[in-house]
């Protein structure tokens, strides 16, 4: 029965780990990370919707007159 040749495994695994590290480092270095993240102020941000600018009356089904 032939023996499994494992003499090149160390070089192969080492080069694979080095390649993965380099590619991961290049991918991460292309991303933009903010230096000082700050929370958003919800009071200053106001969404203007058309129904907020004019008064509308909502009729509840229970408050309508009986027919």
UniProtKB/Swiss-Prot annotation:
Organism expressing this protein natively: Halichoerus grypus (Gray seal)
Localization (cell): Mitochondrion membrane
Protein name: ATP synthase F(0) complex subunit 8
Function: Subunit 8, of the mitochondrial membrane ATP synthase complex (F(1)F(0) ATP synthase or Complex V) that produces ATP from ADP in the presence of a proton gradient across the membrane which is generated by electron transport complexes of the respiratory chain. ATP synthase complex consist of a soluble F(1) head domain - the catalytic core - and a membrane F(1) domain - the membrane proton channel. These two domains are linked by a central stalk rotating inside the F(1) region and a stationary peripheral stalk.
Modified residues (N6-acetyllysine): 54, 57
Coiled-coil residue spans: none
Complex and partners: Component of the ATP synthase complex composed at least of ATP5F1A/subunit alpha, ATP5F1B/subunit beta, ATP5MC1/subunit c (homooctomer), MT-ATP6/subunit a, MT-ATP8/subunit 8, ATP5ME/subunit e, ATP5MF/subunit f, ATP5MG/subunit g, ATP5MK/subunit k, ATP5MJ/subunit j, ATP5F1C/subunit gamma, ATP5F1D/subunit delta, ATP5F1E/subunit epsilon, ATP5PF/subunit F6, ATP5PB/subunit b, ATP5PD/subunit d, ATP5PO/subunit OSCP.
Record-level GO cellular component terms: mitochondrial membrane; proton-transporting ATP synthase complex
Biological process, per Gene Ontology: proton motive force-driven ATP synthesis
Pfam families: ATP-synt_8 (PF00895)
């Amino acid at each position: 029965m032939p023996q499994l040749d494992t003499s090149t495994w160390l070089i192969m695994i080492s080069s694979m780990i080095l390649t993965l590290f380099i590619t991961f480092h290049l991918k991460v270095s292309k991303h933009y990370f903010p230096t000082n993240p700050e929370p958003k102020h919800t009071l200053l941000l106001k969404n203007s919707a058309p129904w907020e600018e004019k008064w509308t009356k909502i009729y509840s089904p229970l408050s309508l007159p009986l027919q």
